[in-house]
Every structure is written in C-alpha cells, then in structure tokens.
Design a protein with these regions (language model features):
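A generic structural signal for well-ordered coil/turn residues at beta-strand boundaries
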Residues: 8-11, 139, 150-152, 187-188, ...
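An accessory alpha-helical subdomain
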Residues: 189-280
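Glycine- and acidic-residue-enriched helix-capping/strand-helix junction motifs
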Residues: 21-31
Length: 280
C-alpha cells in the first residue's frame, strides 16, 4: 500500500499574551525567537498578535486563530493565578468545557514530588497549595499535552472543532512522552499553548515543530535577494516593482526605505523573495 501523503502545513502565527508586554514592563522575546525557530526549518511566520490580559480580547483572538486554519503558537497566561485566563478563553473559543487532563495531572504531581524531595520534606498531595497547582492541568476537553522539559508542567494543543474547521489525524504523529494518545494535526491547523517563560516556551515550541510538522520543513525554500538603491523615491520605483511581480508571479517584491542607516545613509533596499529557482 502507498502511504497517504502528509497533510499540508498552513501558515504559522503567533499570539503573545500578557499585560506586562503591552505596558513595557517586560520586553517580548518570543517574536524574534519564533521567527528564528521557523526559519531554521525552512518555515516563516505569517502574522503575530499581542493581547493583554482581557478575557474578551483573548477569546476573540483565539477564535480568529482557530477559524484561520493556521498553525498558531500562543504564549503566556496558562498558569493558575487570577490573571491567567488563556485556558478558560481557549475553552470558550472552542465552545467546550474545561477538565483536568489525566496525564497533565500525573506530570504535575511528579513535579510536586520532585520539589518535596529536593526540599527534604514529605509530599502532601492534599495540601491546599498542591491541590491548587493541579489547576495548571485543567485544559479544554479534547486538548493534548505538550511536554515541558524544564519543570514537567505541560502546555497543551487544541484543534478546531467541526464548524470551525476539520481536524483530521496526521500521518505519523508521535505521542508525547508518557504514553498519551498521538496528537491530531488537521490540515486546518490548531493552536499550541505554552508558558510565557522563554526557558520553557522555546523548547516546547521546538518539540511541536519537530514532532508534529516535520513534513512541512523545507530548508532553503524561501530566499531573498536585494540591492541598495541610492537617490530614488519609492514612488519612482513602484512601476518597476509592479512589472517584476507581473512578469514573475512566483516572487514577492519588497522595498525597505531608510533615512539614517549607519553605513548607507538615506537609501532604499529593493529586493525579491520566493523560491530559490524563482528568485535566481
């Protein structure tokens, strides 16, 4: 039998959640890192969105992401403090209930046992703070875990329900450590939720890419070529740019003006991007 062809990987998006980013209290590091992680695999980021800790805005952003059919990473807000709303908003966006994920609960208990052991204290599962930590494993029904190599507290993946977009099984999807069911990767994408802490989020995002989307990797599939143009205005270059795109539909033309470049001064970087053959 001929194995089914891998499902296509759609566009990639990023949602960064947290008031601390929008207020400037914390500088976002996720956008450049996600661009780097995707680029190393021949992929690119199509869009990014920043959202504060407003449940209504988070829910709306997640609904748009689910409906887009894109593969989306969402960072932040999956903890168990009052200002963490992402888990609840994800359930609301999907129209499903929240429930304690069995494997997530197991991993969280393992983490609590590790902490007790490190502190030389007995593990007390019924202690109020330990019981509260299990809330970090309360995910939308149907969610699947993303392993966290830093402290075992998992993230989770959700896929569109019928009505938001079909999510069928991916060929060759691997199960996360611990024996969970294989992830479902639909050709309409899904959202992968990770913590806001880079030390946790970035290896988790890499795991998602390498485990769920390796069939989409295409190193060298997107290249750029550009030249520095002096003494020209974008308006005068526009007819040339339009002609290039008209005659070469497989490439995209870009212009990046600069007024105070330390080396070139005032100039325009004019270039094309696309597949290696088309760009050459």
């Amino acid at each position: 039998l001929v194995p089914p062809a891998p499902e296509p990987v759609g566009a990639f998006g990023l949602i960064v959640i947290g008031d601390e980013i929008l207020s400037g209290k914390r500088a976002d590091k996720h956008l450049p890192k996600v661009i780097e992680l995707l680029g190393a695999r021949g992929l690119s980021l199509a869009w990014a969105e920043y959202v504060g800790d407003s449940p209504a805005r988070i829910t709306a952003a997640l609904q748009r992401a689910f409906e887009s059919g894109d593969v989306v990473f969402s960072t932040g807000g999956i903890g168990a403090t009052p200002d963490d709303h992402t888990r609840q908003c994800a359930a609301r966006a999907l129209g499903v209930e929240l429930a304690l994920h069995p494997q997530a609960a197991e991993l969280i208990r393992e983490r609590m046992q590790d902490i007790a052991r490190e502190q030389g204290k007995p593990y007390e599962p019924d202690r109020p703070d330990n019981a509260h930590r299990l809330n970090m494993g309360v995910f939308p029904v149907g969610a699947q875990i993303i392993p966290n190599p830093y402290n075992k507290i998992p993230g989770f993946s959700c896929y569109p329900q019928s009505g938001l977009g079909a999510a069928g099984p991916s060929q060759g999807a691997k199960a996360p450590p611990g024996g969970s069911e294989p992830h479902t990767v639909g050709e309409r994408g899904g959202i992968h939720f990770v913590p806001g802490f880079p030390v946790m989020a970035w290896p988790m995002i890499e795991w998602v890419l390498d485990t769920l989307y390796p069939h989409g990797f295409a190193a060298g599939a997107w290249v750029e070529q550009s030249v520095i143009v002096f003494g020209a205005m974008e308006a005068t270059l526009t007819p040339l740019m339009e002609a290039i795109e008209r005659e070469h539909p497989l490439v995209k033309v870009f212009s990046l003006p600069s007024v105070d470049h330390p080396q070139y001064g005032r100039h325009i970087e004019l270039g094309v991007k696309g597949g290696p053959v088309a760009v050459a």
